[in-house]
UniProtKB/Swiss-Prot annotation:
Name of the molecule in the record: E3 ubiquitin-protein ligase LNX
One record GO biological process: ubiquitin-dependent protein catabolic process
CDD domains, per the entry: mRING-HC-C3HC3D_LNX1 (cd16779), PDZ1_LNX1_2-like (cd06677), PDZ2_LNX1_2-like (cd06678), PDZ3_LNX1_2-like (cd06679), PDZ4_LNX1_2-like (cd06680)
UniProt xrefs under Gene3D superfamilies: 2.30.42.10, Zinc/RING finger domain, C3HC4 (zinc finger) (3.30.40.10)
Organism from which the protein derives: Mus musculus (Mouse)
Record keyword Thylakoid present: no
Spans annotated as Interaction with MAGEB18: 186-244
Enzyme class, UniProt record, top EC level: transferase
Zinc fingers (RING-type), renumbered ranges: 45-83
InterPro entries: PDZ (IPR001478), PDZ_scaffold (IPR051342), PDZ_sf (IPR036034), Znf_RING (IPR001841), Znf_RING/FYVE/PHD (IPR013083), Znf_RING_CS (IPR017907)
Function as written in the Swiss-Prot or TrEMBL entry: E3 ubiquitin-protein ligase that mediates ubiquitination and subsequent proteasomal degradation of NUMB. E3 ubiquitin ligases accept ubiquitin from an E2 ubiquitin-conjugating enzyme in the form of a thioester and then directly transfers the ubiquitin to targeted substrates. Mediates ubiquitination of isoform p66 and isoform p72 of NUMB, but not that of isoform p71 or isoform p65. Isoform 2 provides an endocytic scaffold for IGSF5/JAM4.
Catalytic activity: S-ubiquitinyl-[E2 ubiquitin-conjugating enzyme]-L-cysteine + [acceptor protein]-L-lysine = [E2 ubiquitin-conjugating enzyme]-L-cysteine + N(6)-ubiquitinyl-[acceptor protein]-L-lysine
Region (Disordered), start-end ranges: 185-220, 481-500
Annotated consequence of substituting residue 183 to A: Abolishes binding to NUMB protein
Length: 728
């Protein structure tokens, strides 16, 4: 309790030299530079009053250093200039032109005793590494190498979003929020795209024109950061604080109470709903587990790869931005938005120190502004009318509607082969839907368009416009399938039946062993296995053991019974006891499960042959393997919900019967926070909805089940089958 407050210490211990600017400042501070000339007022940050570093534009039209604005918004929620409300995730990186102007500012080398070089700001770091005698004299290069070997990226050189303080994490994350090819003036993210640290030579620092020596700080700046540090310390001590304590605070807390668990940042808000976002995650060990579970894949109605569960001690939890239900669209630039489950898992398991993910958090219950925006996003042909006739009110049109990030309105993303729209032949991909049955959708949403289509009896009147010239690919925000949640084949794809992800067949194996000899295998699963009830399965086979010598029982086999004793509903402890007590003659009934290899094309760089096969000791069952097991092995549970005042149960379903794809199970795709399904806590993404109030969902079409769920009142019993997602 008598520990001094570091923020108030008049003589703090010197910080290590920064390899970007050559100054000794803490990771919470911007870089310091000495400029040869006065900086133009338009390139000055209105918070620190110095040249912009990593400039960030607010919606109200002002520009600040990313770190300055992030620190300011820790306590405030408005723009410092005009005091209009500002949310960090709504801010955008400044244009390439602004960044180029900043990078060309002339600065002097801070090591004036050894070097008198004058060079552009963006070249200073390279100068330190290659030709600066001062940097060598002060051990800057050695210090950088030592920090790299120690796996410590906080030497003021890199604002990595996952390893530094939460203020820097938020700042770095903003630079990754856009991934928008085709824009005339995209956000400046060259360092992110090139795979370099965010605060590299392209990311510049703050001016320090008044300082003659390289290690001095102005009194005003010190006072400013003391206030910020005190505010952050207060946040760390509150239950609602969403930031993680720094290394000094952690060490002090651990010395006082060793039982306090490690606190991870809660930075969920940095990924906005309904927008495709790119993030970068660092791992000191390239092979460190992500500690998440994944569901989904193109062979299921979920289509996308979705995070089912995040474990508290893993890389993703330490990063603090992702949530269960988030959709992973790309992995290190590789598109996995519509690939088989096992293919996506193989990509995510590739060792790498920097993992780049493009993710989508679906928009939930957010009303969109209908303010008028000029329709000037590119020339389009005159609008035309399309009338589609449904054979029944429940029939789907067979189109997928999405919204674009850079243009308002509703757009056709895909037309399902054989659907109503496809048979009519007039609608095409990228068409913009201006109106449905007289309702203006020029600034509408795909959700409202879907409601209008579903409310139509038989005749759907659409007003559509078509762009004159195809633009470069746009990024879409998904709104769900109009055609029952099932993805249609892309252009040129063959509409062939999908192969099962795994095949099963039963086998009976008899082995002999000495009375004191072990069978030589390790099993997992069992009733009440952590959070799931699972069959007993073989994790590994000991080389040279009884099972290994016989060769018929393999890793991944499901054990059904031993000498006539059923293992389908026993715990792992009970199963091990039964196996150990078996006599010399052992008869094993097992289910062999063979998973199909993903046949996707992939480059050698993306999937190195050395990493394609999981080591036997690290084998774990995949989510798609569980889906292919016979129904009698499926442990079902009843979840009782009561509809809340908003009238929503709080989950989204995909799947069901379709004329062209047959019968598919209904999967839970997403769960809305604060709803009955969320509050109950037993329903997860990827769960299968088998029955509602005792009525089986098998063979139902999507519209029928959705209507039934909306009309049910009071106590609702859902029969759920839940399997654990693939662990990474």
């Amino acid at each position: 309790m008598n520990q001094p407050d570091l923020a108030d210490d008049p003589d703090p211990s010197p910080e290590p030299l920064c390899i970007v600017c050559g100054q000794n400042h803490s990771p919470e501070e911007n870089h310091f530079y000495t400029y040869t000339e006065d900086v133009d007022d338009d390139l000055i940050c209105h918070i620190c009053l110095q040249a912009l570093l990593d400039p960030l534009d607010t919606p109200c039209g002002h520009t600040y250093c990313t770190l300055c604005l992030t620190n300011f918004l820790v306590e405030k929620d408005f723009c410092p200039v005009d005091r209009k409300p500002v949310v960090l995730q709504h801010c955008k990186k400044s244009s390439i032109l602004v960044n180029k102007l900043l990078n060309k500012l002339l600065v002097t080398c801070p090591f004036t005793e050894h070097c008198t070089e004058v060079l552009q700001r963006c070249d200073l770091q390279h100068h330190f590494q290659t030709s600066c005698k001062g940097a060598s004299h002060y051990g800057l290069t050695k210090d950088r190498k030592r920090r790299s070997q120690d796996g410590c990226p906080d030497g003021c050189a890199s604002l990595m979003a996952t390893t530094l303080s939460p203020e820097v994490s938020a700042a770095a994350t903003i630079s990754l929020m856009t991934d928008e090819p085709g824009l005339d003036n995209p956000a400046y993210v060259s360092s992110v795209e090139d795979g370099e640290p965010v605060a590299n030579s392209s990311d510049s620092g703050r001016s320090n024109r008044t300082r003659a020596r390289p290690f001095e700080r102005s009194t005003m700046r010190s006072r400013s950061f003391k206030k910020i540090n005190r505010a952050l310390s207060a946040l760390r001590r509150t239950k609602s604080g969403s930031v993680v304590a720094n290394h000094v605070d952690q060490g002090r807390d651990n010395s006082e109470n060793t039982t306090v668990p490690e606190v991870f940042p809660r930075l969920f808000h940095l990924i906005p709903d309904g927008e495709i976002t790119s993030i970068k995650i660092n791992r000191a060990d390239p092979s460190e587990s992500l500690s998440i579970r994944l569901v989904g894949g193109s062979e299921t109605p979920l289509v996308h790869i979705i995070i089912q569960h995040i474990y508290r001690d893993g890389v993703i939890a330490r990063d603090g931005r992702l949530l269960p239900g988030d959709i992973i669209l790309k992995v290190n630039g590789m598109d996995i938005s519509n690939v088989p489950h096992n293919y996506a898992v193989r990509l995510l398991r590739q060792p790498c120190q920097v993992l780049r993910l493009t993710v989508l958090r679906e928009q939930k219950f957010r009303s969109r502004s209908n303010a008028h925006v000029p329709d000037s996003y590119g020339p389009r042909d005159d609008s035309f009318h399309v009338i589609l006739n449904k054979s029944s009110p429940e029939e789907q049109l067979g189109i997928k509607l999405v919204r674009r990030v850079d243009e308002p309105g509703v757009f056709i993303f895909n037309v399902l082969n054989g659907g109503v729209a496809d048979r009519h032949g007039q609608l095409e991909e990228n068409d913009r839907v201006l109106a449905i049955n007289g309702h203006d959708l020029r600034f509408g949403s795909p959700e409202s368009a879907a409601h209008l289509i579903q409310a139509s009896e038989r005749r759907v009147h659409l007003v559509v416009s078509r762009q004159v010239r195809q633009s470069s690919p746009d990024i879409f925000q998904e709104a769900g399938w109009i055609s029952n949640g099932q993805q249609s084949p892309g252009p040129g794809e063959r509409n062939t039946a999908s192969k099962p992800a795994a095949t099963c067949h039963e086998k009976v194996v008899s082995v002999w062993k000495d009375p004191s000899e072990s069978l030589g295998m390790t099993v997992g699963g069992g009733a009440s296995h952590r959070e799931w009830d699972l069959p007993i399965y073989v994790i590994s086979v000991e080389p040279g053991g009884v099972i290994s010598r016989d060769g018929r029982i393999k890793t991944g086999d499901i054990l059904l019974n031993v000498n006539g004793i059923e293992l389908t509903e026993v715990s792992r402890t009970e199963a091990v006891a039964i196996l150990k007590s078996a006599p010399s003659s052992v008869v094993l009934k097992a289910l062999e499960v063979k998973e199909q290899e993903a046949q996707e094309d992939c480059s050698p760089a993306a999937l190195d042959s050395n990493h394609n096969v999981t080591p036997p000791g690290d084998w774990s069952p995949s989510w798609v393997m569980w889906l292919e097991l016979p129904q009698y092995l499926c442990n079902c549970k009843d979840v009782i919900l009561r509809r809340n005042t908003a009238g929503s149960l709080g989950f989204c379903i995909v799947g069901g019967y379709e004329e062209y794809s047959g019968n598919k199970p209904f999967f839970i795709k997403s769960i809305v926070e604060g709803t009955p399904a969320y509050n109950d806590g037993r329903i997860r993404c990827g769960d299968i909805l088998l029955a509602v109030n005792g009525r089986s969902t098998s063979g139902m079409i999507h519209a029928c089940l959705a209507r039934m769920l909306k009309e049910l009142k009071g106590r609702i019993t859902l029969t759920i089958a839940s399997w654990p997602g693939t662990f990474l």
